[in-house]
Amino acid sequence: AKRYSEQYNYSMDIVYNTIEEMIKTKKPEAVTAFGNIYDHLKIVEVCAPAGIHVMVEKPLAVSLDHAKKMEKLVDKHGIHLLTNFETTWYPTNQKAYELIQQDTIIGDLRKIVVRDGHKGPKKIGVNKEFLEWLTDPELNGGGAITDFGCYGANLLTWIMEGKKPNSVTAI
């Protein structure tokens, strides 16, 4: 927290040791959970009973079991739970969506190819803390397939308005 305080120039007065302490003190309407994926469930377990909405960074959960537990909490307590997939907001993807929705421009989609990747987290310079949980199977849940594969799955689910594909191939 101290490193982030210095890096982003904010006071340590707004840093709390636990989410419970922060919620009790600040009483937020919503929180964002942009840490390791395993902790998404804990954040929802703490926030949902207090009626606090939650936005997590992709993917939603490390497992179907965690996702189902979050779903039950959301339903029981009536909160919103949003998964942020940043690529959805890219202007290029917004334009692609717009063109696809206008039937007369592109026509029926028959095949979609998604390619994602980079040189690797170390080569692109991610910080030590992020690298530690990103490469931990328990904290991350699925490695590169959940870190990058989820973008294509999200974009295509959005573009196809939830219609399931006939087949999927991954290389």
Predicted regions and their residues:
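A general structural motif
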Residues: 12, 51, 78, 107-109, ...
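Predominantly a Rossmann-like dinucleotide-binding segment in NAD(P)-dependent oxidoreductases
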Residues: 90-171
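Short strand-turn motif at the edge of the Rossmann-like AdoMet-binding core
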Residues: 58-59, 85-87, 116
